[in-house]
């Protein structure tokens, strides 16, 4: 696997990513998420396209997933052309026992959420390090640059401590694929993710936040190559 896909090979991520790719069949329109675990899914789908004649269309969530899909030989479409997806597969920064999920470490959570809610089935792939009884990691919040300070003030009133995400290899803040800023907001333990999600969505200037409440299934890869599957209780 190339360095653009993952920085280091991970048996757990590989197992989860490849297992989720097995859910895809010819004729499907597939949402392709962003991150190191779903990179294995994209690569496996590409292998099946080339070796098995798998006929699918992919909808990407970021520049990274677009480049991976092109490298893999997956034909791409857009939500404008195909607004209803059969399945979306994505990674997670953290996921709790009720399948509430925090995403956005790659600053792609706005597009990831749009793609996930456009799919009939949303599957998250992860390793054990991403699972937790309750969510407690910072929540990424994409904001309009124009609205940054008012949004910060309102988020503080919700009990959060926002921090503007800085770029690593350039001066200044991270800029999303949509041209916006990202705030990483520390809330401590999040006891009611659904309520917090609604409160963040109501803040003027917030484009989207990284709390996802629509995960249908979680595929957890293990070091021995096995995969544990957890489904949302209906």
Curated annotation (Swiss-Prot):
It is an enzyme of class 5 (isomerase). It comes from the Archaea. Keywords: Isomerase. One of its GO terms (cellular component) is cytosol. InterPro entries: NagB/RpiA_transferase-like, Ribose5P_isomerase_typA_subgr, Ribose5P_isomerase_type_A. Pfam families: Rib_5-P_isom_A (PF06026). One of its GO terms (molecular function) is ribose-5-phosphate isomerase activity. The active site is at 112 (proton acceptor). PANTHER family: RIBOSE-5-PHOSPHATE ISOMERASE. Homodimer. This is Ribose-5-phosphate isomerase A. It comes from Methanosarcina mazei (strain ATCC BAA-159 / DSM 3647 / Goe1 / Go1 / JCM 11833 / OCM 88) (Methanosarcina frisia). The gene is rpiA.
């Amino acid at each position: 696997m190339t360095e653009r896909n993952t920085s280091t090979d991970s048996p757990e991520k590989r197992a989860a990513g490849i297992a989720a790719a097995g859910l895809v069949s010819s004729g499907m329109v597939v949402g392709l998420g962003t991150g190191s675990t779903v990179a294995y899914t994209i690569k496996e789908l590409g292998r099946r396209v080339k070796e098995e004649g798998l006929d699918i269309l992919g909808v990407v969530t970021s520049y990274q997933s677009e480049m991976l899909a092109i490298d893999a030989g997956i034909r791409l479409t857009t939500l404008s052309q195909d607004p209803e997806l059969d399945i979306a597969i994505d990674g997670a920064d953290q996921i709790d026992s009720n399948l509430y999920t925090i995403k956005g470490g790659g600053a792609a959570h706005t597009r990831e959420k749009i793609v996930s809610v456009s799919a009939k089935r949303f599957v998250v792939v992860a390793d054990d390090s991403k699972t937790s009884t309750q969510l407690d990691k910072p929540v990424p919040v994409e904001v309009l640059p124009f609205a940054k300070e008012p949004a910060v003030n309102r988020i503080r009133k919700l009990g959060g401590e926002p921090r503007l995400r800085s770029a690593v290899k350039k001066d200044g803040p991270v800029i999303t694929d949509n041209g916006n800023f990202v705030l990483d907001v520390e809330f401590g333990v999040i006891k009611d993710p659904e309520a917090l999600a609604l409160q963040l969505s109501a803040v003027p200037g917030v484009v989207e936040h990284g709390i996802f409440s629509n995960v249908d299934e979680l595929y957890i890869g293990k070091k021995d190559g096995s995969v544990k599957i957890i489904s949302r209780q209906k």
